[in-house]
């Protein structure tokens, strides 16, 4: 957003034209003032695109939360942004669209953010070719590495260290697998309920998932889960709440 604001703006215009949309908003959290300023400067002549600075909070980037924050329209249970007349795309997609149209280059590389238990000088953004194995990227893995594809909240553990960079690989979180808290029984504290942005009962849905009670999980609203990970993060017993919910969610889709 700081390096290529003009290209991103052109990419947004191309997507608007393809979707037949007359207005677009680029939402930026308030902890990224330089990005917001760069984009605003690039959009001076584009009156149909604006930059909206939003309060930094998690999970602000979820499409349902983002649409409500920007437009005030609330997306109902089981619905998509299109149901309220909105389409949500990320900045990387806008840049890739510009690149494809302006230069003819398909999506053969992308920016990947690397962070976690690695040397502080190696925690940065890399341009990686699609298909590059994780363990061949220019950073040093810890002795017992665990690679999370994505961030620490919503990311998924890579099955193999040589798994490839894909078009949706926005970042990698490198962890030391030797550091792992002991999982304890649920104490019914309600922390996960308070943390859930969708108003669900994660402790209950995860129990249904663990016991393979798919119908009960569906009735409890598992399909509305954003998979933001706030439940697992808030759990004092270190229960893998989100993992169980993901299993139930996948089974209920069948």
Give the role of each language-model region.
Residues 2-18:
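Histidine-anchored nucleotide/phosphate-binding helix
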Residues 21-134, 139-142, 151-152:
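Hydrophobic alpha-helical positions that pack around
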Residues 32-41, 158-165, 236:
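Short glycine/threonine-rich loop-to-helix capping motif typified by GTGT followed
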Residues 170-183, 193, 197-233, 237-254:
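Ferredoxin-type iron-sulfur electron-transfer modules in oxidoreductases and energy-metabolism complexes
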């Amino acid at each position: 957003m700081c390096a290529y604001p003009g290209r991103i703006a052109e990419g947004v215009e191309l997507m608007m034209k393809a979707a037949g949309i007359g207005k677009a908003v680029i939402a930026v959290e308030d902890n990224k003032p330089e990005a917001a300023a760069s984009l605003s400067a690039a959009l001076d002549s584009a009156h149909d695109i604006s930059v909206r600075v939003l309060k930094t909070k998690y999970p602000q980037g979820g499409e349902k939360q983002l649409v409500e924050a920007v437009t005030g329209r609330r997306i109902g249970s089981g619905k998509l942004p299109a149901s309220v007349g909105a389409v949500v795309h990320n900045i990387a997609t806008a840049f890739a669209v510009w690149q494809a149209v302006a230069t003819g280059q398909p999506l053969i590389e992308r920016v990947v953010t690397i962070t976690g238990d690695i040397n502080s000088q190696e925690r940065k953004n890399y341009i990686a070719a699609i298909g590059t194995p994780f363990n061949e990227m220019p950073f040093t893995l810890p002795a017992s590495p665990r690679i999370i594809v994505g961030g620490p909240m919503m990311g998924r553990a890579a099955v193999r260290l040589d798994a490839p960079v894909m078009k949706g690989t926005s970042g990698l979180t490198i962890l030391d697998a030797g550091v792992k808290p002991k999982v304890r029984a649920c104490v019914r504290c309600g922390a996960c309920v308070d943390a859930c942005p969708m108003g669900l009962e994660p402790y209950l849905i995860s129990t249904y998932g663990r016991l393979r009670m798919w119908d009960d999980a569906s009735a409890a609203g598992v399909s509305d889960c954003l998979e933001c990970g706030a439940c697992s993060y808030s759990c004092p017993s270190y229960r893998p709440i989100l993992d169980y919910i993901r299993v139930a969610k996948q089974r209920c889709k069948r």
